[in-house]
């Protein structure tokens, strides 16, 4: 087997890679005839950027004024709770902290593991229950466990509690689509990807897209 030829390699400066990536995304969306709503544009593009999957241009679903609501929550110091440590690691916590918010994941807590074992349920479900008791408004960023979204829905059905916002992008085959549809039929503000696709990286990308838009707007004032 011969050596790889380098003639098709595009040499890009490190600081230009992201800019070049978004230019490619813009060009491919135009080729496909896809025009994203202005409010949703940068969030969906960042999801495509993190996944290299243009299907998201068709399946990302936003409740009315979702982006404005989410950004206002962040500006007012809302916290973000994730269902995986991977999503937690991917969120830009420095930018979030600049608005007074914190990011949390309870999945590795001993208390959560014990409660889940006792109840014969998932740690993700217990994590959402604990997060619902936080005093501050919480943006729930679910990128892995449909049981987290099912738990959020069930808590809404059993009480007057409502989540401030739901980012629902769990990935997989079992109960994933049904769990997303549960939240879609509620009146809570949400950003959800219909279908089986999603993931912790997608959940983090959505959070970061919101954070970066707020940061950039603040810097341009």
Model-predicted segments: where are they?
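Electropositive, gly/pro-rich neighborhoods at or near active sites that engage anionic ligands
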Residues: 2-79
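Conserved, well-structured core segments that form the ligand-binding/active-site neighborhood
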Residues: 2-21, 160-165, 207-221
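Alpha-helical scaffold segments in soluble metabolic enzymes
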Residues: 20-28, 46, 69-73, 90, ...
């Amino acid at each position: 087997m011969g050596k790889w030829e380098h003639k098709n390699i595009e040499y890009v400066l490190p600081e230009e890679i992201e800019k070049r990536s978004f230019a490619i995304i813009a060009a491919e969306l135009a080729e496909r005839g896809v025009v994203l709503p202005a409010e949703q544009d940068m969030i969906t593009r960042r999801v495509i950027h993190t996944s290299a999957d243009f299907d998201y241009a068709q399946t990302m679903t936003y409740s009315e004024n979702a982006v404005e609501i989410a950004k206002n929550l962040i500006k007012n110091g809302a916290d973000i709770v994730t269902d995986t440590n991977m999503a937690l690691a991917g969120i830009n916590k420095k930018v979030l902290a600049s608005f007074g918010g914190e990011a949390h994941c309870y999945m590795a807590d001993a208390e959560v593991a014990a409660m889940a074992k006792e109840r014969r349920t998932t740690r993700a479900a217990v994590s959402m229950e604990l997060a619902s008791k936080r005093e501050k408004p919480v943006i729930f960023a679910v990128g892995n466990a449909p049981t987290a979204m099912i738990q959020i829905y069930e808590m809404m059905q059993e009480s007057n509690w409502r989540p401030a916002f739901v980012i629902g992008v769990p990935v997989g085959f079992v109960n994933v689509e049904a769990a997303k549809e549960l939240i879609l039929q509620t009146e809570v503000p949400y950003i959800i990807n219909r279908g089986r696709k999603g993931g912790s990286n997608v959940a983090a990308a959505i959070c970061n897209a919101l954070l970066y838009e707020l940061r950039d707007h603040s810097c341009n004032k």
